[in-house]
A protein has these predicted regions:
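Conserved S-adenosyl-L-methionine
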Residues: 122-123, 143-153
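A short, basic/flexible loop-to-alpha-helix module at the beginning of a structural domain
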Residues: 110-121
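Structural motif
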Residues: 124-126, 154, 244
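Ferredoxin-reductase
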Residues: 2-103, 159-161, 186-190
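Reductase modules of NAD(P)H-dependent flavoproteins
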Residues: 13-16, 156-278
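Short, conserved phosphate/pyrophosphate- and ester-handling motifs at nucleotide-, phospho-/glycolipid
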Residues: 48, 133, 250
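Histidine-anchored nucleotide/phosphate-binding helix
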Residues: 134-146
């Protein structure tokens, strides 16, 4: 995904252009490939950061784009980039059509500080992604999964079709195994008969429903039982169940979600946003 409006220098940023080597290429969906790159000198990064990528043609012409890291920072020296094929996109087309393992890629980073998450922030997290906007959020999700004690998390993911659900098996496994990880996936276009999830764009009602479900699970655990009666007897959680939100996707998508979260009472500084485009 092309990244980050308003992101500046962040933890571990290297401002010089360097060379990374492509270790593997994996087709995650019909329009998205995952590229695993080995960084120079075991470079470290934080969950939520991105790298600038630069291509240089034989005649000296250069094209540059920014791509978010989807891998966990627990594995320094290696990053995974989510690159969606954009019609007419110079950099994404080159990666999809020409890049193979062993190729050397020019990059700069890691970049970004406002959109990062580190384990010292322990309040419940809301993550919302549209399409390939899942990339930096996947890094946060994976980092959280490495912890012995981790904050409650709700991840809401909007995609066009079932084929566009990136990292589906990994996400569904986490949701099944981790009682503190809630997952909502919604399809906005082609919906197969077998689909049992949401089928529209993420809106206020969907967010409220997801909030209620996540809050209800918390109340049941606090009561020490799984009965509705115990849930009613448990202390009511605050009206806004999440301490911080991370939203990544197209501009309209991000602004719509952020505006509604402000209406629910979430503080402006606790709503972290990242927009992308071609």
């Amino acid at each position: 995904m092309a990244a980050a409006t308003g992101a500046g220098a962040g933890p571990g940023r290297t401002t010089d252009w360097q060379i990374a080597t492509v270790e593997s290429v994996h087709a995650e969906s019909p329009r998205v490939k995952l590229f695993r790159l080995k960084l120079p000198a075991g470079q470290k990064f934080s969950a939520g950061q991105y790298y600038d990528i630069r291509l240089t043609a034989p005649d000296g012409y250069q094209a540059q784009r920014s791509y978010s890291i989807s891998s966990s920072p627990e594995k320094p020296g290696v990053i995974e980039l989510v690159i969606e094929l954009i019609p007419g996109g110079e950099v994404s087309s080159y990666f999809h059509e020409a890049v193979v393992p062993g190729e050397r890629i020019e990059l700069r980073g890691p970049i970004g500080g406002h959109f990062t998450w580190t384990p010292n922030y322990i309040e419940p997290l809301l993550l919302v992604a549209g399409g390939s906007g899942i990339a930096p959020l996947m890094s946060i999700i994976r980092r959280r999964a490495t912890l012995d004690s981790s904050p409650r998390m709700l991840f809401m993911f909007s995609v066009r079709t079932e084929h566009d659900i990136l990292f589906r098996q990994e996400l569904e496994r986490m949701a099944h195994e981790d009682a503190d990880f809630d997952l909502t996936i919604t399809l906005t276009r082609a919906v197969p008969d077998s689909w049992t999830g949401e089928t529209r764009r993420i809106d206020a009602q969907m967010i409220d429903t997801a909030f209620d479900a996540a809050t209800g699970k918390t109340r049941l655990r606090e009561a020490g039982t799984g009965t509705p009666e115990a849930a009613k007897a448990a202390p009511n959680p605050p009206g806004q169940p999440f301490g911080r939100a991370y939203i990544c996707g197209g501009t309209g998508f991000v602004e719509s979600i952020a505006s509604y979260l402000l209406e629910t009472g979430m503080d402006y500084d606790d709503i972290r946003t990242e927009r992308f485009g071609p």
